[in-house]
Regions:
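Transmembrane helix recognition focused on a "late"/terminal membrane span
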Residues: 2-37, 70-164
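Membrane interfacial helix-start motif at the N-side
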Residues: 25-67
Length: 164
């Protein structure tokens, strides 16, 4: 499969015109990511695949982590709705499959999402970009604990509403 950055003319021009800024913003592994962005094919990002929210937090992609957390919370909410409405076991496997699909999408498109995040932040003039070890905690909060809290709160509310 071809590289999404090379297939989009605006992204390609941005990459060519802002190489130095991108290298400064990436901080650690700058050359590695720049080669991936310039490469002819997309590469799977295994950190994004298996540890998506933590990787996003480390790379300071907090907005993207929040979006992923909302998707996970939505899937948890759908699982609860299935549990209340349906008696079948299919609901758990469907929701689990959707979670795995989300993980797969994060792994496959992780580098492109990272490029788009860098592009957005460079265009906005953000100076503090790079990596952050404390960002791993933010990623855990936004991508793991927030969806669990939202899903749990909705579950409690649904149970209270459905009690006779």
């Amino acid at each position: 499969m071809s590289n999404y950055i090379k297939s989009n003319q605006k992204d390609k021009e941005f990459l060519e015109n802002n190489e130095e800024d991108i290298l400064k913003c990436i901080d650690k592994k700058g050359e590695y990511y720049l080669n991936i962005f310039k490469g002819s094919k997309n590469k799977t990002n295994f950190c994004a695949l298996f540890l998506g929210p933590l990787w996003m937090g480390y790379r300071q992609m907090y907005f993207e982590t929040f979006i992923v957390g909302c998707c996970v919370a939505l899937l948890g909410f759908l699982a609860m709705i299935y549990e209340f409405v349906s008696v079948t076991v299919i609901s758990n496997s469907v929701i689990r499959s959707l979670n795995y699909a989300l993980m797969g999408l994060m792994g496959f498109f992780g580098n492109y999402i990272y490029f788009l995040s860098l592009k957005r932040r460079i265009n906005n003039g953000d100076k503090k970009i790079g990596v952050s070890k404390i960002g791993i905690l933010y990623g855990f909060l936004l991508g793991v604990l927030m969806p669990m809290a939202i899903t749990g709160a909705v579950g409690v509310i649904l149970m209270l509403l459905l009690i006779d």
